[in-house]
Curated annotation (Swiss-Prot):
One of its GO terms (cellular component) is cytoplasm. It comes from Trichlorobacter lovleyi (strain ATCC BAA-1151 / DSM 17278 / SZ). Belongs to the HisA/HisF family. IGPS catalyzes the conversion of PRFAR and glutamine to IGP, AICAR and glutamate. The HisF subunit catalyzes the cyclization activity that produces IGP and AICAR from PRFAR using the ammonia provided by the HisH subunit. GO terms for molecular function: imidazoleglycerol-phosphate synthase activity; lyase activity. Pfam families: His_biosynth (PF00977). Its EC number is 4.3.2.10. The lineage of its organism: Bacteria, Pseudomonadati, Thermodesulfobacteriota, Desulfuromonadia, Geobacterales. Keywords: Amino-acid biosynthesis, Cytoplasm, Histidine biosynthesis, Lyase. The active site is at D11, D130. PANTHER family: IMIDAZOLE GLYCEROL PHOSPHATE SYNTHASE HISHF, IMIDAZOLE GLYCEROL PHOSPHATE SYNTHASE SUBUNIT HISF/H IGP SYNTHASE SUBUNIT HISF/H. Pathway: Amino-acid biosynthesis; L-histidine biosynthesis; L-histidine from 5-phospho-alpha-D-ribose 1-diphosphate: step 5/9. This is Imidazole glycerol phosphate synthase subunit HisF. InterPro entries: Aldolase_TIM, His_biosynth, HisF, IGPS_HisA/HisF, RibuloseP-bd_barrel.
Length: 254
């Protein structure tokens, strides 16, 4: 059985790591390079950087953050936020990223995902889906522009389409659960896991270690992404891995 991955997520704006609730109310959590080094030492399997402002002036800041991080850590880095054209991908990969995460640009121009996969490989091409449950229904709608813009697109159908366009992985965030510490949206995650054959990363809502376990077991995620519980030192990545290993989840120990 493939080992499951634990991925801390760093939301970056203005060169600082922040954490919010349902994409709002941001708190400063520190320097991204220092935090990345700490997670590397704790045995994180990967790290995800999301540039949550992603303005053109912020792009150079993010390239610097990625470059400085890649010089000092050994785990794979995924970078997302404002990836709009092939040149954005090239810059991030040249700075030391291993994968890029495409969100808004995929909705605006789905063939961009195909171009990215053909140029750089599916293994580099992650499609991020921010989804919110449709009130009173067992379906989820895709949102873009950092969760600000509803699209009318069904999240499960979108994941299937993105796989067909060459995405190698889906980063699936429940906007309803983001920062709430109430646990992943297991129904959303399971629906996408069952619909695609590529790995799905569960994101949004981890408040304790059992939530990670549920993400791997009940929802079937290949990887679990978390921020608050790690940033604010509720748990270390190592503690999370020891807990999961103790409950029978195949995990890479360091």
């Amino acid at each position: 059985m493939l080992t499951r991955r634990i991925i801390p997520c760093l939301d970056v704006t203005g060169g600082r790591v922040v954490k919010g609730v349902q994409f709002l109310e941001l708190r400063d959590a520190g320097d991204p390079v220092e935090i990345a080094e700490a997670y590397d030492l704790q045995g994180a399997d990967e790290l995800t950087f999301l540039d949550i402002t992603a303005s053109s002036d912020g792009r150079d800041t993010m390239v610097d953050v990625v470059r400085h991080t890649a010089e000092r850590v050994f785990m794979p880095l995924t970078v997302g936020g404002g990836i709009r054209v092939v040149e954005d991908i090239r810059r991030m990969l040249n700075a030391g990223a291993d994968k890029v995460s495409i969100n808004t640009a995929a909705v605006s121009r789905p063939e961009f995902v195909n171009e990215a996969a053909e140029r750089f490989g599916s293994q580099c091409t992650v499609v991020a889906i921010d989804a919110r449950q449709v009130p009173g229904e067992q379906r989820w709608e895709v949102y873009t522009h950092g969760g600000r813009k509803p699209t009318g697109i069904d999240a499960v159908e979108w994941a299937v389409r993105m796989e067909s366009y060459g995405a190698g992985e889906i980063l699936l965030t429940s906007m309803d659960r983001d920062g709430t510490k109430d646990g992943y949206d297991l129904a959303l995650t399971r629906a996408v896991v069952d619909a695609v054959s590529i790995p799905v990363i569960a994101s949004g809502g981890v408040g304790n270690l059992e939530h990670l376990y549920d993400g791997f077991t009940t929802a079937g995620a290949s990887a679990c992404l978390a921020a608050s519980i790690f940033h604010f030192r509720q748990h270390t990545v190592q503690e999370a891995k020891q807990y999961l290993q103790g409950r029978g989840v195949p995990i890479r120990m360091v």
